[in-house]
Curated annotation (Swiss-Prot):
Keyword Hydrolase attributed: yes
This protein's name: Probable trehalose-phosphate phosphatase
Enzyme Commission number, as recorded: 3.1.3.12
Residue numbers binding Mg(2+): D35, D37, D213
Gene3D superfamilies: HAD superfamily/HAD-like (3.40.50.1000), Trehalose-6-phosphate phosphatase related protein, domain 2 (3.30.70.1020)
Lineage: Bacteria, Pseudomonadati, Pseudomonadota, Alphaproteobacteria, Hyphomicrobiales
Family, similarity comment: Belongs to the trehalose phosphatase family.
Active site, UniProt feature: D35 (nucleophile)
GO molecular function terms noted in the UniProt entry: metal ion binding; trehalose-phosphatase activity
Superkingdom field: Bacteria
Keywords from the UniProt entry: Hydrolase, Magnesium, Metal-binding, Plasmid
Pathway where this protein functions: Glycan biosynthesis; trehalose biosynthesis
Residue numbers binding substrate: D35, I36, D37
Organism: Sinorhizobium fredii (strain NBRC 101917 / NGR234)
Chain's role: Removes the phosphate from trehalose 6-phosphate to produce free trehalose.
């Protein structure tokens, strides 16, 4: 029975944790794609408040080497910010849900920032200046409105972002996440970013494992499932999710990564 069949037929989707532990016997045939917030790192009240456990960058770097470099971060964060989080380790990254990407060979692809979009971001900051707890995050070619500290503002903020999307035009799309609404380039999604990596060495020819925690990760779940890979969600199983398995928490995933990184294989 294949690992994928086991995940699909298991009564407890938490079998994903056992599967990742089994990677140690077949690292040469897998590629690993990891979301950051809520997946590698615990969610925080604001984007800048996330804490990176001191040992995590080195654990990821060791695991990447065991995978022959076939480990990439796929995140809503921008490339530069993601690099700061895991410095001095350096990985292929798809940022802004795929609007930015650094290939394994170091080439960087970025969406263009326009003057009109810069003005729109400034208007969003001004419109929410008196909304205590609401945070507008400038991501360059994307903008996110966070309401984790102001949940009562959700409806108003969603309406404001729909207005902003109309102003931005057809080249942009709205993305909902955990206590956040984001406007990003319409052509960008995590599924396409994973597919692009899988067309390049060292990812090419390997089966993909995608791990995420949010609706923003569903696109990469669908992509890896379609390609015969495995999708794993952080948190309790959710019937509406495309994920084939689950791991209870970001802390549990970090423990698995640390264990894999330490194996003498």
């Amino acid at each position: 029975m294949s690992c994928q069949t086991q995940l699909l037929s298991a009564s407890e989707a938490a079998l994903g944790e056992d599967f990742l532990s089994a990677l140690s016997t077949d690292l040469d045939n897998w590629a690993l794609f990891l979301d950051i917030d809520g997946t590698l790192l615990d969610l925080a009240e604001t984007p800048d408040a996330v804490a990176v456990p001191p040992s995590l960058p080195a654990s990821l770097d060791h695991l990447s080497k065991k995978l022959g470099g076939a480990l990439a971060l796929v995140t809503g964060r921008g490339l530069d910010y993601a690099d700061q989080l895991f410095s001095p380790a350096n990985f292929p990254i798809a940022g802004l849900h795929g609007a930015e990407r650094r290939d394994p060979d170091g080439r960087v692809h970025k969406a263009a920032e326009t003057a009109d979009f810069e003005r729109l971001k400034a208007e969003l900051v001004a419109a929410t200046a008196s909304w205590a707890g609401v945070l507008i995050e400038d991501k360059g070619a994307a903008v996110a409105a966070h309401y984790r500290l102001a949940p009562d503002r959700q409806l108003e903020l969603e309406q404001l972002m729909e207005w902003a999307l109309y102003r931005a035009g057809p080249d942009w799309a709205i993305q909902h996440g955990k206590m956040v609404v984001e406007i990003r380039p319409a052509r960008a999604n995590k599924g396409d970013a994973v597919a692009a990596f899988l067309g390049q060495p060292p990812f090419a020819g390997r089966r993909a494992i995608a791990i995420g925690d949010d609706v923003t990760d569903e696109a990469m779940f669908r992509t890896v499932n379609r390609l015969g890979g495995l999708s794993i969600r952080i948190g309790p199983p959710v019937p509406a999710s495309e994920a084939l398995g689950s791991i209870p928490s970001a802390e549990a995933l970090r423990g698995i990564i640390a264990a894999l990184a330490l194996l003498n294989i």
